[in-house]
Amino acid sequence: MDEKKIIIDRAVLVGLNADCFTPEETSSEKTLDELEALLETAGGECVGKVLQNRHTPDPHSFIGEGKADEVRQMVQNGGANLVIFDNDLTPSQLRALEDLMKTPVLDRSALILDIFAQRARTREGKLQVELAQYQYYLPRLTVWNEEMGRLGGGIGTRGPGETQLETDRRYIRSRIQKLREELAEVRKVRAVQRQRRIKNSVPVVALVGYTNAGKSTLLNLLTGADIPANNRLFDTLDTTTRQLTLS
């Protein structure tokens, strides 16, 4: 019997703290720890972390050639096959970093989209994730095609599918438009359901909180639902509705 090979990504995590960054843009030990948790959620393993302090990002390679070479050495010494940045990168920065480090590079947004691709269960959720992935990868199409050849599967390659994202920009733009139309139809159905609840005077309560805060656990306790509630980030992606009767 043929045994299916399971790809375990080993990654070096990199963050940049620049003086010119806003609090939302900057990286820190805390955000790198969260990035490691995201990596574990995606099925990967962290083999090292690098946090760099600079006045401004390097316009070409974001962290500079010297630091990129340091990360490349960490990749080699740790047996890593992936570098993930805590900050968002431009297409040109992605290309420059891959050329310098000779390793596939992802940023935080790509990692989160990969997790979403694994977790989406409903039709609406899957449509939303596919649309987000196409919108993210469209300006990065050339870099992503090169990454696909290096990664060969695993983190950063899940979702719409390799063959679709290797096609031309015209197809992707057409697919984006199609997804938007399908989502509009799904939202019409949701709107009808909301109007029905309003008409029937059904009170609506929303549970809101950060990822892994315990929303699904609380909903299960209140309603007797059986929603998966694991201790990991973005475990429940889709919106869930349950009925609660108060006595």
PLM features: residue spans?
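N-terminal accessory targeting/assembly segments
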Residues: 1-108, 112-113
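Short alpha-helix plus adjacent loop in nuclease-associated cores
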Residues: 110-132
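Short acidic/polar capping segments at secondary-structure boundaries
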Residues: 110-111, 139, 178
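A charged, well-structured terminal subsegment
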Residues: 131, 135-148
